[in-house]
């Protein structure tokens, strides 16, 4: 099993001023971590729940 390409992308908070609780996959640590997404911009390494992050990037 191979994780999707976006699991290897660095976290990007985006360029707006809002704060949404989100999770990203930290490739070097092989785990999902919380961060605050600004509401726009960013990248595909962003998940609404830790469960979604783990499912997509760890296959669990």
From Swiss-Prot:
Signal peptide: none annotated. The keyword Disulfide bond applies. Its main location: secreted. It comes from the Eukaryota. GO terms for molecular function: calcium channel regulator activity; serine-type endopeptidase inhibitor activity; toxin activity. Disulfide bonds join 7-57, 16-40, 32-53. It is found in: Secreted. Pfam families: Kunitz_BPTI. Residues 7-57 form the BPTI/Kunitz inhibitor domain. Transmembrane segments: none annotated. Expressed by the venom gland. PROSITE patterns: BPTI_KUNITZ_1, BPTI_KUNITZ_2. Keywords: Calcium channel impairing toxin, Cardiotoxin, Disulfide bond, Ion channel impairing toxin, Neurotoxin, Secreted, Toxin. GO terms for cellular component: extracellular space. PANTHER family: BPTI_KUNITZ INHIBITOR DOMAIN-CONTAINING PROTEIN, KUNITZ-TYPE PROTEASE INHIBITOR-RELATED. Belongs to the venom Kunitz-type family. Potent blocker of high-voltage-activated calcium ion channels in the nanomolar range, particularly the L-type channels in cerebellar granule cells. The sensitivity of L-, N- and P-type channels to CAC is tissue and species-dependent. Blocks the L-type current of cardiac cells, depressing cardiac contractility. This is Kunitz-type serine protease inhibitor homolog calcicludine. The lineage of its organism: Eukaryota, Metazoa, Chordata, Craniata, Vertebrata.
